Amino acid sequence: LFIIISVLISKVVINSLNNFKEGLLSFFSYLNRESSKVSLLNESSNDEFGEMAKVVNDNIEKTQKSIEEDRRLIDETIAVLGEFEQGDLCQRLNISVSNPALMELKNVVNNMANNIETNIDNVLNILEQYSSYNYLNKISTKNLKEHLLKLANGVNTLGDSITQMLV
């Protein structure tokens, strides 16, 4: 009788462990991007394995939600940067995520877009004034670096050169 009970208990424990293992392997496959879906662990047993499965399932669902949230922001970032590449600087990232690093990246991209759009608008404004024969205003070079600084200096030099020609 003891041997039969031991065998039955062993089978139940081994079966529960195998179910738990399969669920974890499915989750790790999802985390490692080997699978696009994640399966929850079987939490139907009324023992410690069922309790552990419930805790793990809660965390799988939280992690899955977070990963999907991150993917949506990454997809939106790719789309927005594709528009930037074509010259549309009005685009911004709008999705909010719980991942602090991705939120910081979102803010950096949006701030960069704001700054570049403002600087390009400043250049266009001055060029529009030049086309109306008004060469008095200049582009501020404060806080500009490299290419934007060269662009602003180039436009300012153009205005100075035209003014010198007219004098």
Residues of each region from the PLM?
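Polar/charged heptad-repeat coiled-coil helices used as signal-transmission/dimerization stalks
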Residues: 4-167
